[in-house]
């Protein structure tokens, strides 16, 4: 343990925080181009075919991004908007694709939680 005199001479350095989404380089979102659109299987105990895309960002980095919602229209060369946010049961997937932005269409017939999937408010019947 250091003495008070040693701490006066050289104070304690604060711990550096590592970013959870370094490829975005401190931006809220980044534009990218889909290289591949595939499915991945989650970790135990879950079972599914989760839709993911390999995306080359405008920074030049390649990341794996999750495509949320039911159904999508993405294919190779689609331009997408990528935000941070990991998928807990998919190792290595630390980014999400923003639905309803650029080439990625919104989820059809979405009634609740629409803002997360880019869906417009449905017309009310009178």
From Swiss-Prot:
HAMAP family on file: Ribosomal_uS12_B
Organism phylogeny: Bacteria, Pseudomonadati, Chlamydiota, Chlamydiia, Parachlamydiales
Keywords carried by this UniProt record: Methylation, Ribonucleoprotein, Ribosomal protein, RNA-binding, rRNA-binding, tRNA-binding
Database matches in PROSITE patterns: RIBOSOMAL_S12
Region listing for Disordered, in residue ranges: 1-29
InterPro entries the record matches: NA-bd_OB-fold, Ribosomal_uS12, Ribosomal_uS12_bac
Self-association and partners: Part of the 30S ribosomal subunit. Contacts proteins S8 and S17. May interact with IF1 in the 30S initiation complex.
SUPFAM superfamilies to which the protein is assigned, alphabetical: Nucleic acid-binding proteins
Biological function: With S4 and S5 plays an important role in translational accuracy.
Gene Ontology terms describing biological process: translation
Protein name, per record: Small ribosomal subunit protein uS12
Residues bearing the modification 3-methylthioaspartic acid: 89
Family as reported in the entry's similarity comment: Belongs to the universal ribosomal protein uS12 family.
GO MF annotation list: rRNA binding; structural constituent of ribosome; tRNA binding
CC annotations in GO: small ribosomal subunit
Record carries keyword Metal-binding: no
């Amino acid at each position: 343990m250091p003495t008070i005199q040693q701490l006066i001479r050289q104070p304690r350095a604060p711990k550096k925080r590592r970013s959870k989404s370094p490829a975005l380089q401190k931006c809220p979102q980044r534009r990218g181009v889909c290289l591949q659109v595939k499915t991945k299987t989650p970790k135990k105990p879950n079972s599914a075919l989760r839709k993911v895309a390999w995306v080359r960002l405008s920074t030049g980095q390649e990341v794996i991004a999750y495509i949320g919602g039911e159904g999508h229209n993405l294919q190779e060369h689609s331009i997408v908007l990528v935000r941070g946010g990991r998928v807990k049961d998919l190792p290595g997937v630390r980014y999400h694709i923003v639905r309803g932005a650029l080439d990625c269409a919104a989820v059809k017939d979405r009634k609740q939680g629409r803002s997360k999937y880019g869906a417009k408010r449905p017309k009310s019947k009178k």
